[in-house]
Amino acid sequence: QEFHDDYRKNKLGKPSFVKVMQGINLLKKHGVEWNAMAVINDFNADYPLDFYRFFKEIGCQYIQFAPIVERILSHEDGRHLASLAENKAGTLADFSITPEQWGNFLCALFDEWVKEDVGKYYVQIFDSTLANWMGEQPGICTMAKTCGHAGVMEFNGDVYSCDHFVFPEYKLGNIYSKTLVEMMHSERQHNFGNMKYQSLPTQCKECEFLFACNGECPKNRFSQTAEGEPGLNYLCKGYYQFFKHVAPYMDFMKNELMNQRPPANIMEALKNGDLKIEY
């Protein structure tokens, strides 16, 4: 509750945790399946296990953890967030997670999940990482080679390339003048999706874990490489820490799947000491 109410307040400035839990309990009462997308910020990032165990306690089997990274930049039209095009402008928002926090959060959470919860609780980034390890589609655009399939429509009918790119330069049109098919299958949108791969800096292209993250979301690529090349993901250090940490576990689960065995076998292997992890 403390994590939630620190930022999640209603329009009167009051905490909203109780209302959210009432909604969840109503869904459970009527047998409605649900999942959670939890934002990881500067506060809750330091408590990964408390955060994860809470979701397990309330019966949430499907969890997506989304790191929040935003830059503040005021515009004349009233906007206060910096777009990717403004990659050298803006100030990192106080609520943003650091790369180190993100890496530590994922590793700590994974260590509990891989020992106790494989096949019981489904954490999207772990599932997506295993999919990429297998050479399959990851099921989430941020970790895919290309993107462009997650357009968003605003209340007035304006359509943008992505819900992370609701900026004037990424507006595709309006539903009153163009169809969704026209906009989402346009050359402009196709180019937007391909730029996810084409705009990667050399450091990413030469990285041993490119296959696993594919540069993550372009929205976060406002940092520079050690050589000064633009386009490096702000969270790169955290993701690299995570992939390096989980590599031997992913190798084991991949082998299980390749041999038509459940990846959940890793829990028994770890328990029996059959799987030796060396970093």
Give names to the regions the model predicted.
Residues 2, 6-18, 25, 29-142, ...:
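Radical SAM enzyme [4Fe-4S]-AdoMet core and its adjacent flexible, acidic
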Residues 155:
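A cytosolic small-molecule/anion-sensing beta-strand core signal
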Residues 166-279:
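Flexible mid-to-C-terminal extensions adjoining Fe-S/redox cofactors in radical SAM and related proteins
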